[in-house]
Amino acid sequence: MLETKTIIVTGASSGIGEATARRLARAGANVVLFARRAERLAALCAELDSTGKHTLAVAGDVTLAADRERLVRATLEKFGRIDALVNNAGYGQRGPLERIPLEALRANFETNVFSLVALTQLVAPLMRAQGAGRIVNIGSVAGRITRPLSSAYDSTKFALEGITDGLRGELKPFGVQVVLVRPGFIRTEFGQTAESVSAQVYADAGPYASYLDYFETNRAKLRRVAGVPDDIARLVEKALAARRPRRCYNGPLHAKFFLFMKWLLPACFFDWALRMKKAE
């Protein structure tokens, strides 16, 4: 189903993006890898090409218009069309919203939301002209369940939920399908990136310091149930290969459980369950 399809994957140098690129290449797709880390991209591209796959590595920053345009141009020059886009690039940050600088919050939205929209705006007209295409947005369980001390990142994923729903309705008449994939906890470099981005906020946490200590302790426990990147890559492949894809794919199992409980239980229960606690 995916053989010879040309698919762009952003954030392809590690984690979910890398696993997705590998899985799509195995399925016979022409995979275009996009991320900032040029050396990692080149190594992955060379590895996949050595097995007879057709790939293209484009190093760039998704927040830069020139890099987004170069990505689309390079893809068309090599493969002649774009059949699908996997919007995976993004990062998280943690800490009390009161202490997060507005420029840091804007930067998070720039990468996770606005750049995704901007790249989609470049690709959607091409798909409309073809009369077919598919866009898969990588959201998060955090787009449905906001945790205290994670509201900056979680709010970007809430925004993505609305954008995906709107795009789905707008592009469907033109044969373009839009799908959301919601990962739960996944073992990737995502947590390390969030720690780096949030370091200054943690250092100046003030009255929130003890709550952040508990938050980190609890987060470490959740790693025990975390899935692996290929759990999500498998869902992305399903979303791309299905003739009639679902609106949303959730995974792994713990993500489905949390979302079911969110649907089943009253909001006051979640406020209680997710309340901030101090480290002992």
Feature names for model-found ranges:
Residues 27-44:
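Conserved glycine-rich Rossmann-like NAD(P)H-binding loop of the short-chain dehydrogenase/reductase
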Residues 140:
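Residue(s) in the substrate-gating loop at a strand-loop-helix junction
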